[in-house]
Swiss-Prot record:
This is Phosphoadenosine 5'-phosphosulfate reductase. Gene3D superfamilies: HUPs. Its EC number is 1.8.4.8. It holds the Pfam family PAPS_reduct. One of its GO terms (biological process) is hydrogen sulfide biosynthetic process. It catalyses: [thioredoxin]-disulfide + sulfite + adenosine 3',5'-bisphosphate + 2 H(+) = [thioredoxin]-dithiol + 3'-phosphoadenylyl sulfate. Keywords: Cytoplasm, Oxidoreductase. Catalyzes the formation of sulfite from phosphoadenosine 5'-phosphosulfate (PAPS) using thioredoxin as an electron donor. The gene is cysH. InterPro entries: PAPS/APS_Rdtase, PAPS_reduct_dom, PAPS_reductase_CysH, Rossmann-like_a/b/a_fold. It is found in: Cytoplasm. HAMAP family: CysH. Its main location: cytoplasm. The lineage of its organism: Bacteria, Pseudomonadati, Pseudomonadota, Gammaproteobacteria, Vibrionales.
Length: 253
């Protein structure tokens, strides 16, 4: 597969761009996750970064990317409402993997947002979307801009939800390459990878959480619930980070 120039692809029509990326994705599907990471770092134009919510299986992507390029910027969009265990997990993995961590937050503090808008997460889908835009989307766009990122790695997996089932490994979003190396991994593959590298799950995994985000929009799994129903009161699966331009994302791993 030839090297891809972002500027060249952005100059194409949407149809031409889609067809070109589809050809590449056919080949990427044949590679292992490790091979995909190496290929992306060698063949995609622009500085790389990995976004991480430091969720249940976050250690997988952190290991995969940093073992190839140890100084890759790790971007965390911190809402200020993460679980205490998440902040401890961030410290643990940052120390264990010597992460080049960059933390971005909303322009308004959590208290300021509540004073202005009330508790947005209690205001239905519209409120949740506004909350996500303020605390996830805008800080992430600022991160990509300030760090001059051209290749954005994320740990989304098709198995996690219906909204992710048809995502490609490589796409373009917000003017950068978006790359999902473990898109086709199963929970079993994730488990064995963590075991092989002696890496931990998020601490709340043992307490029955399948997905972890903010304290006020994360529920412990109960019998009969899907993973999607444990987030945002079942109203949404995605946190908004990559719903821009018709694409979907969320915490990933």
């Amino acid at each position: 597969m030839p090297k891809l120039q972002l500027s060249e692809l952005l100059s194409l029509t949407k149809v031409e761009q889609t067809l070109r990326l589809a050809e590449v994705n056919v080949e990427l599907e044949k590679l292992t996750a490790q091979e995909r990471v190496v290929w992306a770092l060698e063949n995609l134009e622009g500085n790389p970064a990995l976004s991480s919510s430091f969720g249940i299986q976050a250690a997988v992507m952190l290991q995969l990317v940093t073992e190839v390029k140890s100084d890759t910027p790790i971007i965390l969009t911190d809402t200020g409402y993460l679980f205490p265990e998440t902040y401890q997990f961030i410290d643990q993995l940052t120390d264990r993997l010597n992460l080049n961590l960059h933390v971005f937050t909303a322009d308004e503090s959590p208290n300021w947002q509540e004073a202005r808008y009330g508790k947005l997460w209690e205001q239905g889908v519209e409120g949740i979307e506004k909350y996500n835009k303020l605390n996830k989307v805008q800080p992430m766009r600022r991160a990509l801009d300030q760090l001059e990122i051209g290749v954005w790695f994320s740990g989304l997996r098709r198995e996690q939800s219906g909204s992710r089932a048809n995502l490609p490994i490589l796409s373009i979003q917000n003017g950068v390459f978006k790359f999902l190396p473990v898109l086709d991994w199963t929970n079993k593959e994730v488990h064995y990878f963590l075991k092989e590298y002696d890496l931990p799950y998020h601490p709340l995994w043992d307490q029955g959480y399948l997905s972890v985000g903010d304290t006020h929009t994360t529920q412990k799994w109960e019998p009969g619930m899907s993973e999607e129903e444990t987030r945002f009161f079942g109203l949404k699966r995605e946190c908004g980070l990559h719903e821009d331009d018709g694409e979907l994302d969320g915490s990933g791993i």
